[in-house]
Regions:
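Sec-dependent N-terminal signal peptides of Gram-positive bacterial secreted proteins and lipoproteins
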Residues: 2-27
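Structural motif marking the loop-to-transmembrane transition
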Residues: 1-2, 110, 417
C-alpha cells in the first residue's frame, strides 16, 4: 500500500516554499571571508548539520598523516572488544617513529593500545590494533556470528588465520610481513567502508597509522571536508571522547600523555588529533562545543618544519570566526503548520498531517533560508496513520541541509460499494447512525 501511495504522491505532489524571515537575504560565500590561513586545505563544519561554514580547497584530496587515527580508533571500538588481548607481530614492531616500542610477541589489551594510539600517536600501536581487530572480525565471520557484509575478506588468502580453541591471536608473533599486510588490508577495508557510508567518497585509507602510502586505487588521502565529517561521526561515540580527552594513561611499564595541546589552549575542545609526515605537512582535526554550537575544524598541509604552531593559529582563527558569525536559529519548531490534504474517495474529505522532527541550524545573518513543503494536492483513500505523504526540506543558500517526512495523522477508509449500500439503507430506514 505504501509503495502505491508513494507513486501517487510522486505524480501529484505540489511543492511550495516559505522563505525564512532573516535580517538579510544577501548571499555571501565563505570563500569571500579571507581568514589568511596557513593551511592549504581547511574547513569549518557545523558538527550537527554537516554544513560547511568556511572552506578553503576543502574538497581537494591530500594526505592526512596521523589524523587517520581517528577512523582507526572508532573502527576498533566498533569491531573489537576493549578487553581483548592483542599480540604484537614482527611487522607491527617494525613501524617507524613515533613508537610505543612494542616488542614482537608482546601483548596488550585493545583498551590500552587505543590510548597509545590517540594520546601519543604511536604507529606500531596502530598496526597492532589493525591486525588484532581484523583477526576478531575474521573470527566473528568464521563463527557465523555475522556475515562479511562489506566483502572485505574477499580474494584474500586467510589460510594462516585459524582459531581452533576460540579467539586467540598469539599466532601473530609468527606470521610473515605479507600476512600482516593482509590483515591490515582487512582493517583498512573496514575503514574505507565506513568512510563511504558517511559520504566520504574521496577518502582512501591504506595504512591505519597515516604513514604515506599508495596502491592501485590511489594515494592514502582525504579532503579537509571529509576529515571533518569523519570527526563529527567519531565524537558521537562516548568511548572515543573519553579516550581522546584523557590527559594521561598508564599500563604496565608504559605511560602515555596527551599530545593534543589544543585541549588546554582553547575552551570547549571535545577531541582532536594531530598529524605530520613529510608529504602531508602538519595536519590537525578537532571538535569544539561552545554555547550549544558544535564546530569541527580540519586543516591539511598546514605548514612544514619549523612551522609547527601554524595549526594552532589556524584552528583558533577558524573557531573564533565561527563563534562570531554563526548563531542557532529555529527553522522548524514543534508546532510547524502544515495544510491538510484533500482526500478523494474517502469517508473524510481532509487528511491532517504533521512532522515529527524539529530543525535548528547555525546561520549567519546573510544566509538565505528556504523551507520547501512537498505535499500532494490530493490523495486517494485509503490512508493510514503513519503513512508518509510528503516531506519538508530546508535549504540554506540553495544547499539541502535538512529533510523530514510528512506523516498522515488519521486513518481514512475508502468509500466502496458496501459504504454506499449502507448509506442507501440508512436513508430508507431513517437511520441516523
Amino acid at each position: 500500500m505504501k509503495k502505491w501511495l508513494c507513486l501517487v504522491l510522486f505524480l501529484t505532489t505540489l511543492t511550495y516554499s516559505i522563505t525564512a524571515l532573516l535580517p538579510s537575504r544577501i548571499r555571501v560565500s565563505a570563500a569571500e571571508d579571507d581568514l589568511q590561513l596557513h593551511a592549504k586545505y581547511a574547513v569549518l563544519l557545523d558538527g550537527d548539520s554537516g554544513r560547511v561554514l568556511y572552506g578553503k580547497n576543502e574538497d581537494t584530496p591530500a594526505p592526512m598523516a596521523s589524523t587517520t587515527k581517528i577512523m582507526s580508533c572508532v573502527i576498533a571500538l566498533e569491531y573489537g572488544l576493549k578487553e581483548m588481548t592483542c599480540t604484537t607481530s614482527a611487522y607491527a614492531a617494525s613501524m617507524p617513529d613515533v613508537q610505543l616500542n612494542a616488542k614482537k610477541g608482546e601483548t596488550f589489551t585493545l583498551n590500552d593500545l587505543l590510548y597509545s594510539l590517540m594520546l601519543k600517536s604511536h604507529n606500531d600501536s596502530a598496526v597492532i590494533i589493525a591486525e588484532n581487530v581484523a583477526c576478531y572480525y575474521i573470527y566473528q565471520v568464521q563463527s557465523g556470528i555475522y556475515p562479511d557484509t562489506y566483502d572485505v575478506l574477499s580474494g584474500k588468502d586467510l589460510s594462516f588465520v585459524s582459531f581452533p580453541s576460540g579467539f586467540d591471536t598469539s599466532f601473530l608473533q609468527n606470521i610473515t610481513t605479507e600476512q600482516s599486510k593482509i590483515l591490515v588490508a582487512v582493517f583498512t577495508g573496514l575503514m574505507n567502508e565506513k568512510a563511504v557510508s558517511l559520504g566520504c567518497t574521496q577518502t582512501h585509507f591504506i595504512t591505519p597509522n597515516g604513514l604515506d602510502a599508495s596502491d592501485e586505487t590511489g594515494e592514502h588521502a582525504t579532503t579537509a571536508k571529509e576529515l571533518a565529517v569523519i570527526m563529527s561521526y567519531c565524537i558521537q561515540n562516548e568511548e572515543f571522547l573519553a579516550i581522546t580527552q584523557t590527559k594521561e594513561h598508564q599500563f604496565g611499564s608504559y605511560s602515555v600523555s596527551n599530545a593534543n595541546a589544543f585541549l588546554n589552549m582553547y575552551d570547549g575542545v571535545l577531541s582532536g588529533k594531530t598529524g605530520f609526515t613529510g608529504n602531508a605537512g602538519y595536519c590537525y582535526v578537532c571538535a569544539c562545543r561552545y554555547d550549544g554550537k558544535t564546530f569541527i575544524a580540519a586543516l591539511l598541509a598546514c605548514g612544514w618544519p619549523p612551522s609547527k604552531t601554524y595549526k594552532w593559529q589556524d584552528c583558533r582563527t577558524l573557531l573564533n570566526w565561527g563563534k562570531e558569525h554563526f548563531n542557532h536559529e529555529e527553522i522548524i519548531g514543534k508546532n510547524f503548520p502544515l495544510k491538510s490534504i484533500t482526500v478523494t474517495d474517502g469517508l473524510k474529505k481532509e487528511l491532517p498531517v504533521s512532522i515529527h522532527d524539529t530543525c535548528r541550524l547555525l546561520l549567519r545573518k546573510e544566509d538565505l533560508v528556504n523551507v520547501v513543503i512537498n505535499t500532494p494536492d490530493s490523495i486517494a483513500a485509503p490512508v493510514f496513520i503513519g503513512d508518509i505523504v510528503g516531506s519538508v526540506c530546508v535549504y540554506v543558500n540553495d544547499a539541502l541541509l535538512f529533510s523530514t517526512p510528512v506523516y498522515a495523522d488519521a486513518c481514512i477508509r475508502r468509500t466502496d460499494y458496501l459504504y454506499f449500500l449502507n448509506q442507501v439503507i440508512k436513508s430508507f430506514c431513517f437511520i441516523d447512525k
